[in-house]
Amino acid sequence: MQHLAVASDMTQTLFLGLALFAVLLWIFTQHCNIAVGLLLGVQVWAIAAGGETPFLDVGFSLLPSDLLAACAVLVAGARLLRRGAPPRAELLLLLAVVCLIAWSIQRGTGTFGLTSAANDARVYFWQFFASALYVATAPLHAGRARVVVRLWLVSAAAYAALSLAGWVNTGLHSVVDAATVGGQVYDPRPVPARSALVLAQSAVLLLCPWGGKGGNSSASARPVEHGPGGDRGRREGRTTDGGRRKVLPALLCLVLVVLLQHRTVWAIVIVMAVVGWAMVPARAGQRLACAAAALFSSCVVTLVFAAGMFGRVGSVLAGSFLETQDENSTFAWRVLGWQELLKGPKTLVEWLLGSPFGSGYDRWVGGVVISVSPHDFYLHVLLRLGVVGLLTLLALYLLLWRRLGGVGNGTPALRLVVVSHLVLFVSYSPFPEQGVLLGLCLWQLRADAADRSGGGPRKPLVDRSMMKRQEWTGIRKTVNTGMERDQPREWDDDSPSSRPSRRPALRP
């Protein structure tokens, strides 16, 4: 009887899981924006709850993010098969990486078992590239990029709230301070580096203009054209005021990034700032003015910091910065681990195609066996996908950087996102939510190409609500014109005070 009860519970759980999967698959198919919100929301929930709770055992513990990634891959594959047209070069590179990942998982399952292979590939490969592929193949509808950016900013606001709540609970401490609560050592930073990176990228999305060189941006980013008789100056003024309103939340995001003390994210912000400055047009001294303003701000901050006006916050940040120069710093620990991983025996096939997922990352660092991932995505890809996978990944990002900077589709914010990923990969493997931004870069290139082509996309980049408003406006104009045509012209056309009557003339 006990075995029957267990079997009944497993059957019910399986049916519930299949029903949930069917609902999610319908959402991913019919409601792309909601699906992107789920991909971002599950990561916020995982950080707020301290991790995801498995809800099904299928040979390995199935997490909610795994289920969402499976839906994303299935729907993206169906889109590619239904479209029938050959995808663009950058999308082909992404598909090549996904195929290499699937093949490595299959090899790892046969050698080390499904659990080991799935746990090795699930976060930094499966979930990351699944999100990227889903967003990259999303239908070309007007406002898609704007919705994705807004969802990204909502997740950043959630991380900001979690950071503030953590500081209220435990206070602000330096990374070098080993704090304990209830006898357990905890990280003094309230949220991990992935959350700080989302905040930094949100500042970029808020501050950078969304559009291409020469003003020929995609329809999703094209400003509304001014109709005849419209107040263009007033509308441009509203746009300028909206840009100014974005400065304050962007600065708040950057302040939180500094206080969170994730030094890798600090480096990412610095590199993005330098690259962003290099992309500023050199005409009219704009680049020189930006450099002068940045130098002046840096000098002021340095003087205030040296004078001790930041108080305890300044000492906390100074301790975190000095830790990077110590011989026992976390970066030095990572470098030692990288060297040990590269010393392992490798055959020619392993160098070219990598070892299968589940092989492990055991290495000796400081007399201790370390088994966590390499903390370097370039090395991570080399170990699992080989030189072929690493070159494919680099080609994908270099092609994105080049094409996002071309005439007609240059998007400074997305180019800086590409830069942030390339710097992040030095110290971390990519987090699942970063796949949404990678997919957005690919989607934006598709949208720009559709705008430039004569035939346009299969689904036009036109807001349907705007089309309906234009249709109703045309109907009203037609009705009014017909009524005026039937009215007798009895008013004085030369009199400025005369107005036509909207009421039809009464017949005697």
PLM feature segments, named:
Residues 223-228, 236, 383-421, 447-448, ...:
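Hydrophobic transmembrane alpha-helices and their immediate junctions
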Residues 23, 130-131, 146-174, 188-280:
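Alpha-helical transmembrane segments of multi-pass inner-membrane proteins
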Residues 277-325, 344-347, 506-507:
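A membrane-periplasm/extracellular boundary helix in multi-pass inner-membrane enzymes
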Residues 204-205, 413-425, 430-471, 477-480, ...:
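Transmembrane alpha-helices of multi-pass inner-membrane enzymes
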Residues 62-72, 90-105, 113-137, 147:
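Aromatic-anchored transmembrane helix interface
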Residues 32-39, 85-100, 134-164, 223:
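Interfacial loop-to-transmembrane-helix boundary motif in multi-pass membrane proteins
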Residues 1-80, 101-107, 421:
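N-terminal signal-anchor transmembrane segment
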